[in-house]
From Swiss-Prot:
<dbReference type="InterPro" id="IPR043129">
    <property type="entry name" value="ATPase_NBD"/>
</dbReference>
<dbReference type="GO" id="GO:0005737">
    <property type="term" value="C:cytoplasm"/>
</dbReference>
<feature type="region of interest" description="Disordered">
    <location>
        <begin position="36"/>
        <end position="69"/>
    </location>
</feature>
<dbReference type="GO" id="GO:0003682">
    <property type="term" value="F:chromatin binding"/>
</dbReference>
<keyword id="KW-0539">Nucleus</keyword>
<comment type="function">
    <text>Involved in several developmental processes including organization of plant organs, flowering time, anther development, flower senescence and fertility, probably by regulating the chromatin structure.</text>
</comment>
<dbReference type="Pfam" id="PF00022">
    <property type="entry name" value="Actin"/>
</dbReference>
<protein>
    <recommendedName>
        <fullName>Actin-related protein 4</fullName>
    </recommendedName>
</protein>
<keyword id="KW-0217">Developmental protein</keyword>
<keyword id="KW-0963">Cytoplasm</keyword>
<dbReference type="GO" id="GO:0016514">
    <property type="term" value="C:SWI/SNF complex"/>
</dbReference>
<dbReference type="GO" id="GO:0006357">
    <property type="term" value="P:regulation of transcription by RNA polymerase II"/>
</dbReference>
<dbReference type="GO" id="GO:0035267">
    <property type="term" value="C:NuA4 histone acetyltransferase complex"/>
</dbReference>
<feature type="compositionally biased region" description="Basic and acidic residues">
    <location>
        <begin position="47"/>
        <end position="56"/>
    </location>
</feature>
<keyword id="KW-0156">Chromatin regulator</keyword>
<dbReference type="InterPro" id="IPR004000">
    <property type="entry name" value="Actin"/>
</dbReference>
<comment type="similarity">
    <text>Belongs to the actin family. ARP4 subfamily.</text>
</comment>
Length: 443
């Protein structure tokens, strides 16, 4: 088997916001990059591209090479992954492989994995066992698809799929806990008992960091703040130390790329100024709250007031989002629950004997869990909603890096344990039993 010393496993976690990859045994992932990709459809060819192609074909026929198969090129799209996204390109759409926490486009995931292995970690995947973190809500079909890609395309020697909630639990040294994972695309609450997710306890909500960022953006827009994406202007020096912002005219920029760049700025505003209010947000009470200033990339300074408290409070009270102009409400807003309700519902779906233990170790993880005061407020509200004399303890790592990467860190710990080495689903087993065997090897 894969003894710990001679070959290190790779741990990879593709979330809806970012992809984390690195070596098992490390304390943080080596590569972290966005999980969205830029895509340019290469069908409608521009005249320039056509001329280039014709010239190429002519030179190829001189050199005796065959011209490229045109049919193949008709539907091709070129994907830009990782740092390539930072550069604006004409007609580049930004697309995500995930919808509601599950993968919908495997081609993009494949490109993300490939980028992580070949460009960031600089490894040959054929030489390393892979531990892949998967959502607690993953279906059997999704798992088989991931396993098939890994064995058939990357020819990995061994594979293990571990659930996000279990890994978060391991990251804080527990085998039983209630994991509240608030990531970019969604928030998932799941009970973990003795290292297994109790599927009946899993509760999900579409409110994650990206939704809060959108609320922040729409709220600022409604107050007349214009967020200029970084690519859309340049600063021109008009005097010593004085700059004038000049807008650049880039008509072929897609809406999705513009939105992606504006979200990046709104997200930074959210991370810089927001904190969860101690009690439920109330427009009147927070009307005169002191503002915090934030400087946008183009130099204008904005003042953020009540929104600092209102935006994070959407996690606790989703209906608040409907008071922000321009935010699309959820199709069924009644079914979207706040965090404390999700926690109580999840615990109540578990066996009576373990409820006490779950409530006394509620773990926070995911990027959105780093909002200030979230831990204290959640503890207070769950305590109010739970019955009488239960002890409620919300645990969260003191530093936000550990909260953000807790799934990856749990994977790093798990894959480097000596006792874990017999758990791998090996290539030999895959060839003997087929892909469906993953359901038995990785419960």
């Amino acid at each position: 088997m894969y003894g710990g010393d001679e070959v290190s496993a790779i741990v990879i976690d593709v979330g809806s916001y970012s992809c984390k990859a690195g070596y098992a045994g490390d304390d943080t992932p080596k590569a972290v990059f966005p999980s969205v990709v830029g895509s340019i459809e290469q069908t409608g060819e521009t005249d320039e591209a056509k001329a280039d192609k014709e010239a190429e074909a002519a030179s190829d026929s001189k050199n005796g090479a065959k011209p490229m198969d045109v049919d193949k090129a008709k539907t091709k799209r070129k994907l830009y992954v990782g740092q390539e996204l930072e550069f604006r390109r004409d007609h580049m759409e930004v697309i995500s492989p995930m919808k509601d926490g599950t993968v919908t486009d495997w081609d993009i995931v494949d490109n993300i994995w490939n980028h992580a292995f070949r460009q960031r970690l600089l490894i040959n995947p054929e030489e390393h066992p892979m531990l892949i973190a998967e959502p607690s809500t993953n279906t059997g079909q999704q798992r088989e698809k991931a396993a098939e890609l890994m064995f058939e395309k990357y020819k990995v020697p061994a594979l293990f799929l571990a659930k996000n909630a279990v890994l978060t639990s391991f990251a804080s040294g527990r085998a039983t806990s209630l994991v509240v994972d608030s990531g970019g695309g969604s928030t998932v609450v799941a009970a973990v008992h003795d290292g297994y997710v109790l599927q009946k306890s899993v509760a999900t909500s579409p409110i994650g960091g990206e939704f809060l960022t959108d609320c922040m953006m729409k709220s600022l827009e409604s107050k007349g703040v214009v967020i200029r994406p970084r690519y859309s202007f340049k600063k021109k020096e008009v005097g010593p130390g004085e700059y004038k912002v000049v807008d650049l005219d880039l008509p072929n920029t897609t809406e999705s790329y513009k939105l992606y760049c504006m979200r990046a700025i709104a997200s930074d505003i959210k991370e810089s100024v927001c904190r969860v209010p101690d009690t439920a947000f109330d427009e009147v009470a927070y009307a005169n709250v002191p503002t915090t200033s934030y400087e946008l990339p183009d130099g204008q300074t904005i003042e953020v007031g009540a929104d600092r408290f209102k935006i994070p409070d959407i996690l606790f009270n989703p209906s608040l989002s409907q008071t922000i102009p321009g935010v699309d409400g959820f199709a069924d807003s009644m079914s979207v629950r706040g965090l404390p309700r999700m926690v109580i519902d999840s615990v109540n779906r578990c066996d009576v004997d373990i409820r006490k233990e779950l409530l006394s170790s509620i773990l926070l993880s995911g990027g959105s869990s780093s909002i200030l005061q979230l831990k204290e407020r959640l503890e207070k509200e769950v305590l109010e909603e739970s019955s009488g004399n239960t002890r409620v303890k919300v645990l969260a790592s003191g530093n936000s890096v550990e909260r953000r990467f807790s799934v990856w860190i749990g994977g790093s710990i798990l894959a480097s344990l000596g006792s874990f080495q017999q758990m791998w689903f090996s290539k030999a087993e895959y060839e003997e039993h087929g892909v469906s065997y993953i359901q038995r090897k990785c419960p």
